[in-house]
């Protein structure tokens, strides 16, 4: 089994958390979306959406995050011979509810404009370069260019940004209420619902928004402290973004983009 992913990707974090929690072995391939590696023709042919993660088991390829997690759940049950009682209807409902909030727009809105626009321009140049290399994929690459411009338009729309924030606030308020009576999101046992939520909280922390969105909610703050102690969190997220590590991770990527842009090597 192979997983194409990157530590920056929320959906990648979700799948990796599930893999670690289930104890499933896999081969890891890093595909950095900020440096444009997800636009390489070999990856693009496998996944024309150019989104992460991509899970592959032999000839079987799964692109949807929840479908990947459900597939991993079935693998774990077959391997153990025991049905996971924590994977129930409530868990699935929470998984889908959490996914409804789109993190990309919110994240980009909290990145300084000069850096965001610099990376955006770099990625557009990467797409154009790959289009020249693989003309048979031109229509798919054109679609990615349109998506990039659409995203920039949304970032200029105060209404779109407000709706994204309001959606997140409603979700966190609902989680806060739920955690009033349970240790974890779908009960007193850790489940795949938590796997979907944890990367959202990690993203807020990465953006230095923990005080506003997490600490201000008592139950959520206690939950956040609890899940960060899990070995899966430490391996998937903590090793890249805890303390000084987040600066090392971000600086390394930023320098790559700067150098490639200066050399015009896309």
UniProtKB/Swiss-Prot annotation:
UniProt xrefs under InterPro entries: Glutathione-S-Trfase_C-like (IPR010987), Glutathione-S-Trfase_C_sf (IPR036282), Glutathione_S-Trfase (IPR040079), Glutathione_S-Trfase_N (IPR004045), TCHQD (IPR044617), Thioredoxin-like_sf (IPR036249)
CDD domains: GST_C_family, GST_N_family
Keyword Membrane: yes
An individual GO BP term: response to toxic substance
Subcellular location: Cell membrane
EC number: 2.5.1.18
GO terms of molecular function: glutathione transferase activity
Enzyme class: transferase
Record's protein name: Glutathione S-transferase TCHQD
Lineage: Eukaryota, Viridiplantae, Streptophyta, Embryophyta, Tracheophyta
Gene designation: TCHQD
């Amino acid at each position: 089994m192979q997983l194409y992913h990157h530590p920056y990707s929320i959906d990648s974090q979700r799948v990796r958390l599930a893999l670690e929690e289930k104890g499933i072995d896999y081969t890891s391939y890093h595909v950095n979306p900020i440096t444009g590696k997800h636009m390489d023709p070999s990856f693009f042919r496998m996944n024309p959406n150019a989104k992460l993660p991509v899970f592959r088991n032999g000839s079987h390829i799964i692109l949807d995050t929840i479908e990947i997690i459900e597939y991993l759940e079935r693998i774990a049950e077959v391997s153990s011979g025991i049905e996971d009682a924590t994977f129930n209807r409530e868990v699935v409902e929470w998984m889908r509810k959490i996914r409804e909030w789109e993190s990309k727009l919110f994240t980009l809105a909290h990145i300084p404009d000069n850096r965001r626009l610099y990376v955006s321009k770099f990625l557009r140049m990467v797409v154009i370069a790959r289009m020249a290399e693989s003309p048979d994929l031109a229509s798919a690459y054109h679609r990615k260019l349109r998506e990039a411009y659409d995203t920039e338009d949304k970032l200029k729309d105060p209404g779109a940004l407000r709706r994204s924030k309001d959606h997140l606030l409603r979700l966190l308020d609902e989680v806060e209420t739920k955690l009033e009576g349970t240790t974890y999101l779908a009960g007193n046992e850790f489940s795949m619902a938590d796997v979907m939520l944890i990367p959202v909280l990690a993203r807020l922390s990465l953006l230095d928004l923990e005080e506003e969105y997490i600490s201000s909610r008592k139950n959520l703050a206690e939950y956040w402290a609890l899940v960060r102690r899990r070995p899966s969190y430490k391996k998937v997220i903590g090793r890249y973004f805890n303390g000084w590590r987040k600066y090392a991770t971000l600086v390394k990527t930023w320098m790559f983009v700067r150098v490639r842009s200066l050399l015009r090597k896309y």
